Amino acid sequence: MALLTVPISAESRYKMINDDLVNFINEVCDVLEIPVPNISDDFRVFENNTRMAMLEIEKGVPTLYLSDRMETEQDYYFAVAHELRHLWQCLTNEKYWLGNYKTVEEIGITAYNRQRLEIDANAFAALIMVLSFEMVPTFPSLDLETRHMIEVRARQIMPELDD
């Protein structure tokens, strides 16, 4: 089943960076014990229209870019939590998390999704969705093995979130 991606008007996009989203970003950063990155709605940085959020660190300054496209509001929040976990990865142990990183073009989508930094970011974002919205992401586009890897990692992360 294909998911509908709806373009959002400039007026609506402005409303997306609202108090709820800013509060969510602040709360996730607080959980991760990381500084809040700059937030930009300059969606022109996106190479394709399937991503909803993207983290970029330039000269040591992190910026979270928010796209003008979303599948659902929950998907949007998931993408934000996922990208904030990537910031945490860079700030806590960049060599460990990104040491063997490969792009999807280099290794294909399945191997890309199974990289430790992606498994970790997906697991963290899934837990945040459960805690924040009582929603359990099902990852329908991922194969069973990748979903299992995310589930195992989520169980490892859970005690960190109980503190």
What are these regions (language model features)?
Residues Q74-D75, C90-I119:
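Post-HEXXH active-site segment of zinc metalloproteases
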Residues F78-L91, A121:
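Active-site recognition of the HExxH zinc-binding catalytic motif
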Residues W88-N100, V130-P140:
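Substrate-binding/catalytic groove segments of enzymes
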Residues F24-E27, V31, E83, M149, ...:
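Charge-rich, solvent-exposed alpha-helical interaction surfaces
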Residues Y14-V36:
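Zn2+-dependent metallopeptidase catalytic core
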Residues A111-R114, A123-D163:
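Long, well-structured alpha-helical subdomains associated
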Residues A2-E11:
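Acidic/histidine-rich, surface-exposed loop or edge segments in extracytoplasmic proteins
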Residues V31, N38-T63, M70-Q74:
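Catalytic zinc-binding patch centered on the HExxH motif and its immediate surroundings
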